[in-house]
């Protein structure tokens, strides 16, 4: 398969797909962490032009240079035979991942993925970097596992920055509540925006 790759949306006709071309570093050891990083960041689907742009941005920040990355359509006959194909689902998973897991010696271990995630993260602008807790897991913890007094790091969807807060209470329906919005007009116990189910978060301690 070589070390070139074409990363394209799993949806639709392969012959008409806009995707990202990698001239080097196209093996699973590079591509898997890059795709996982985009999932962690919560980017729009890869089938959306915005998703393609975000992946290219992350790659450009990480690899640098001027010649290794391109945005292009698949050739009329589909993905070129000398390019490793990666079909990306709308939730940022590699649809044909089992092929590489079984047959590619470059398939990375969990430790290697985490190490590269940290390298990718450090290469991004400081304001865009994510906390280590998010790099360690792409899944939000079960709300029922969160306890009063625990510290969580969460993504503020308005300002798109990561913040920390302490769980202040558990609502009657079992949803943890923070105390980040509080005013005489709308006390924190009544403000729906304090409910943790509305955020992407990880438990710090």
Where are the predicted features?
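Short beta-strand-centered aromatic/proline hotspots
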Residues: 161-171
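Short aromatic-glycine-enriched beta-strand elements
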Residues: 175-179
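Mixed-charge, Lys/Arg-rich low-complexity intrinsically disordered regions
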Residues: 134-148
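Intrinsically disordered, low-complexity, charged/polar segments
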Residues: 139, 180-205
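Low-complexity intrinsically disordered segments
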Residues: 38-136
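Short beta-strand scaffold segments in enzyme catalytic cores
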Residues: 4-9
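Short, solvent-exposed aromatic-acidic interface loops
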Residues: 18-29, 182-184
């Amino acid at each position: 398969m070589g070390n070139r790759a074409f990363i394209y949306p799993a949806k639709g006709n392969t012959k008409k797909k806009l995707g990202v071309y990698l001239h080097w570093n196209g093996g699973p050891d590079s591509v898997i962490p890059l795709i996982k990083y985009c999932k962690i960041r919560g980017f729009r689907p890869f089938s959306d032009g915005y998703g393609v742009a975000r992946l290219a941005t992350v790659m450009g920040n990480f690899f640098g240079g001027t010649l290794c990355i391109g945005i292009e359509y698949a050739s009329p006959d589909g993905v070129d035979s000398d390019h490793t194909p990666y079909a990306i689902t709308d939730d940022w998973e590699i649809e044909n991942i089992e092929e590489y897991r079984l047959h590619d010696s470059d398939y990375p271990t969990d430790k290697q993925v985490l190490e590269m995630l940290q390298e990718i993260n450090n290469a991004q602008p400081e304001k865009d970097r994510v906390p280590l807790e998010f790099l360690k897991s792409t899944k939000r913890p079960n709300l029922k596992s969160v306890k009063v007094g625990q510290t969580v790091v969460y993504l503020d969807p308005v300002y798109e920055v990561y913040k920390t807060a302490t769980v202040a209470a558990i609502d009657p329906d079992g949803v943890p509540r923070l105390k980040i919005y509080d005013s005489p007009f709308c006390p924190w116990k009544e403000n729906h925006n304090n409910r943790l189910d509305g955020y992407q978060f990880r438990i710090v301690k």
